[in-house]
Amino acid sequence: MTPEELVHAARAWRDEDPDPETRSEVEGLLGPAGGGTPDVVALVDRFGARLQFGTAGLRGEMGAGPNRMNRAVVIRATAGLAAHLAATGHAGQPVVVGYDARHRSDRFAADAAGVLAAAGFPVHLADRPLPTPVVAFGVVHLGCCAGVQVTASHNPPRDNGYKVYLGDGAQIVPPSDTEISARIDAVGPLASVPRAAPDDPRITATGDALVDAYVAGAVAQATAPDARDLRIVYTPLHGVGRDVLTRVLVGAGFAPPVVVDEQADPDPDFPTVAFPNPEEPGALDLSLALAREVDADLVVANDPDADRLAVALPDPAAEGGWRALTGDEIGIVLADWLLARGRGSDRLVVTTIVSSSMLARLAARRGVAYAETLTGFKWLARAALDRPELRFVFGYEEALGSCVGTLVRDKDGITAALAFAELAASERRRGRSVLDRLDDLATELGVHATGQRSIRFEGVDGLARMRAAVDGLAAAPPVALAGVPVAEVEDMRLGTRLPPTDAVVLRGEGVRLIVRPSGTEPKLKCYAEAVVPVGARAELAAAREHGRALVATILDDAVAGVT
C-alpha cells in the first residue's frame, strides 16, 4: 500500500469502528485533525496486512485495524462463521460462546453472541470467565453446532484471540478454516452486520449448570480412590482455572490445593510473570517457593485459560530441590499410568510429530494402537474421532497439552491435573515417586532427550521471513545433526505422509530435528530429540547427560543455520 492508500484504509476503518477506544487510536495515527503527518510505520503494521483466520481461529495483539484483535475484527469473523454454519446446514442451531479473563475478552464475547443471535442462532453465553476446556465440553454437552472461546491462552497480556469449535467439540481443521475465512472476506460494511442486544431472548447465560456438568464429568473419570494422600500446590498463573480445578480435585477426594496467593485471582496483566506460559523460565518460581514452604508433594500449574498443565516434583538432585517436568515427560508417564489402568488392544494413544517418539515405543510394548498427527490438538482430536472402532485413552503434545479420555475433545489442563494427582498419590502410596516411574520407562524404552528453541520474527514481514527460513532449510539441509549423518530429509509441505504443513524434518540414527513456524505467534520453532539406549538402570544418569548434550548441539546448530 502507498501512504495515501494506508491513510484512506485507516479513515474508512475509523468511520465504521464501533469501539471509541480503537477509533481514537486510529485518529492519533492519522495525525491531528487540523493537519500533521500520519504515522506510516504504525499504519502499515495495522493496515498493511490482516489477521488470518486459520485452524486456530484468530490470535494477535489488540488494537485498531485488520491486523489486530478488536471489536470490528470479531464482529466480521463471527458474521463469517454464522454464514458458514448456515451454509452447512446448521441454521437455527445453538452455539456456545465463552471467554477468559483477558482485557476485552468479555466485550468480544458479547459482540460474538450478538452477531450469532441476530443471525438466528440461539446462544449460550458464559456469564463469567471460563476455562477453555469447559467451553469445549459445552459444545457437545449443550448440543451446539459450534462454540467460540475468546482467549489468547498463554500469550502476552497485549494479545487476545478467537477460537472456534464445531459441533463435535473439536477445533476446526481444513477445509473448514478456509471456508470460514472466505465467508469473513465476503462480509460487507460493518453497519450491514446485524447485532442483537445483550438482553435479546435468543442469548441465555450458561450460569452454574455448565460448570457443574463439567466438574461431574471430570470427577467421574477418577479412579484409585484409596490413593489421595497428597499435598498439592497450585497456580492458575493469574488465569481462570482455580475454582474449577479445586472443585474437581476436591470432588475426586483430594484435599483442596494450596494456591499461590499472588497468582490466585484472574489478572489480565499477569503482573508476577514475564510471560503467562508455564513453560517459560521463572513462571513457576512462586509455586516452587510455596511448595518448599509447605512441604508439598506436587506442584501443578495451568496457563491462564487452563488448557495446559505444568508439573513439578520434589527431587533432591535438582536445584532448589524441585524439578519441573517437560511436556514429553508429563505425556509419557500419564500415558503409561492410564494404559496400566485398563486392558485391550483396541485402545488408542496419540501424539504429534514434534513430541517425543517415546510414546510410539510405549504403545508397541503395551500392545495398543498409536497415531501420530500434525502439531495442534485439532489433529489429535480428529485422530480419535476418525477411529471410532478404537477407545481413545490419551493424547498429548510436548507444549504441555494433554487430553485424558473423551470428556473434552481438546487439551484440558484440569482433567490432566486430576490424572497426574492420582498417579502421584498412587506412587506415593507404594513408597515411590513419579520420578521412579519415569526411570522405569527410560530403562525399558531408552532415554529420549528432547528440547526446543524459538526464534521470533517481528514486524509485518515476519511471516515471509519465517517461510524463507523454512525454504532454505529444505533446499540446503545440514549434512549432520550433532555429528550424526542426516539420513532423511522430509519436507512436510509436500504432504506425502500427513496433510501438508509448514515443517521440515531431519532424521539420523537416534537423532531428529524438526523446524516449523508457530501457528499462533510470529516465531520459528526448532525441536530436537536424541534417543540413547539404556542397558541397565545404573546407566541412566550418563545416558541422560549424553542425550542432553546431543540435543543442545542440534539446537545450537539449528538456530545458527536459520538466523
Regions found by a protein language model. Give the residues of each.
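Conserved phosphate/anionic-ligand binding catalytic regions in large, soluble enzymes, centered on
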Residues: F47-N67, A152-N155, P236-V248, P304, ...
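An N-terminal, well-structured beta->alpha segment
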Residues: E5-A112, T204-D229, V240
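Short Gly/Thr/Asp-enriched flexible loops that form oxyanion-binding sites at enzyme active sites
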Residues: F108-L116, D159-L166, L245, D307-I330, ...
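Glycine-rich phosphate-binding loop plus the immediately following alpha-helix
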Residues: Y165-P194, D328-R347, T351-R361
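N-terminal small/polar loop signature for handling phosphorylated ligands or for N-terminal nucleophile
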Residues: A91, V96-D159, V248, G253-V311
